[in-house]
């Protein structure tokens, strides 16, 4: 399952916290670190790629 979540620089923090607090799937692959820094520099909506494996 591949989820694309459009989020702002503020939403990224909320999303990252939720992902860390909610380990529902066996494998959770989240790409935030690189996008976080970019989002902080520019207030452009960033797409978070969340790969969940059943």
Curated annotation (Swiss-Prot):
Q: Does the keyword tRNA processing apply?
A: no
Give the transmembrane ranges: 28-50
Q: Which domain of life is it from?
A: Bacteria
Q: Which UniProt keywords apply?
A: Cell inner membrane, Cell membrane, Membrane, Stress response, Transmembrane, Transmembrane helix
What's any GO biological process attached to this entry? Answer: cellular response to heat
Task: Please tell me what else the database record remarks about this protein.
Answer: Entirely encoded within the coding gene for gnd (AC P00350), on the same strand within another reading frame. This protein is produced independently of gnd.
Q: Please report the name of this protein according to its UniProt entry.
A: Protein GndA
The source organism is Escherichia coli (strain K12)
User: What gene is this protein a product of?
Assistant: gndA
